[in-house]
Regions:
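Catalytic metal-binding acidic patch
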Residues: 35-81
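Ordered hydrophobic segments in well-structured contexts
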Residues: 33-37, 55-57, 288-290, 297-299
């Protein structure tokens, strides 16, 4: 493994690695359409234990061997696809396979969809943006259905028909594992995780956003409370599980699969206990969507506030109304009653719901 370079050093990849790969592709006569950082077949399936894994997609249909090279002491491997082969893998669905092949297909598709383009971004986005959204929503819906959770804001609904406590704890852990997986995928974190450690939650949670939740999530997955405090009763523990699950899904849904829209401070404020226990309101704020609780707020571009994701995440009309009312009280306490006058609250809510399509 490389000693002096950080695989998360995007500048090094953009400046040195990308240049070398493009030069080699040109030498082979390949017209490169786009290049992804960390890709579907790179982990565990690459032919060598490389330090940096890329996927190169070219406009031709002929096969080409992988690109393997050393760049400033760093081992780089790029899996090369023709456009037709790449599209075929992206087109794989949840049907027609069973057992290990089923999971391989989904994993290959997902990692290709959620890898970060470092070259040809516009071409990649134009072709696969909707597929990424569809894949994310399908995953979210499937897990919501399998766990019989009415919404992510209604934890109690999962426990009304009481099962054995051990079974409920297992279901909660699976739910949190999936939420973490969604967030890792959305941040392109397949690239940063430990190589060849295929167990989903044994990967290393790296990056600014994930570093803040790594210890807490690890504790919850081990059946403990974050920071070693509080009761480990099912109700207390599951409440934290669903709080962190909702956070991971929320960040994944609205980051547009990029971490750049959220700062470490945003996540840190969101993770404060009073914030986790308060409903989050979502409403328009100028050209952005403002996400507001009593203790934290951050803005998201409206293009990323997908109506279906809002619904699946449990942001019903009631929750949006609660958020607006909480925001109005918050501003009123600061002497800014004019921000959301009470008599405009219902009209504002209706406008928001129409614009968000909920």
């Amino acid at each position: 493994m490389m000693k002096d370079k950080n695989i998360g050093d995007v500048n090094f990849i953009d400046r040195n690695v990308l240049t070398a790969v493009l030069r080699e592709a040109e030498r082979r006569g390949l017209e490169v359409r786009f290049i992804l950082m960390g890709g579907s077949l790179s982990e565990g399936l690459a032919s060598s234990a490389s330090d940096i894994d890329l996927v190169v997609v070219h406009d031709g249909e002929r096969k080409s061997n992988n690109i393997v090279m050393i760049v400033e002491g760093v081992k780089v491997e790029a899996t090369v696809f023709g456009q037709q082969d790449f599209s075929r893998i992206i087109g794989m669905g949840r049907q027609g396979a069973a057992g290990a092949a089923y999971f391989w297909q989904l994993d290959a598709r997902r990692r290709l969809l959620f890898s970060r383009p470092i070259h040809g971004h516009d071409a990649y986005e134009a072709q696969f943006r909707q597929a990424r959204l569809d894949d994310f929503v399908a995953d979210l819906a499937e897990f919501q259905k399998s766990l019989a959770i009415k919404s992510f804001s209604d934890v109690k609904g999962a426990f009304d028909d009481a099962l054995h406590e051990d079974d409920l704890r297992i279901r909660c852990r699976i739910h949190l594992e999936h939420s973490v997986d969604l967030l890792l995928s959305s941040l392109g974190d397949y690239y940063f995780r430990e190589k060849y450690r295929m167990a989903r939650i044994r990967r290393s949670l790296k990056g600014d956003c994930l570093a803040l939740v790594e210890d807490s999530i690890s504790a919850l997955l081990s059946g403990r409370m974050p920071a070693g405090g509080g009761s480990t009763s099912l109700s207390a523990w599951s409440g934290q599980v669903f709080a962190y699950s909702s956070l991971c899904q929320y960040l994944a849904a609205f980051s547009d699969f990029w971490s750049g829209w959220l700062t470490v401070g945003d996540v840190e404020r969101f993770l404060q206990k009073p914030v986790l226990e308060s409903p989050v309101g979502i409403f328009l704020f100028d050209k952005d969507v403002l996400c507001q609780s009593r203790r934290a707020a951050f803005k998201i571009p409206t293009a990323f506030a997908n109506a279906m994701a809002l619904t699946l995440l449990g942001f019903s009309e009631v929750r949006v109304a609660e958020g607006i009312e909480a925001y109005a009280r918050y501003e009123s306490a600061r002497g800014r009653d004019e921000v959301v006058p009470g008599n405009l609250l219902q009209r504002k809510l209706e406008e928001i719901m129409v614009k968000l399509g909920v």
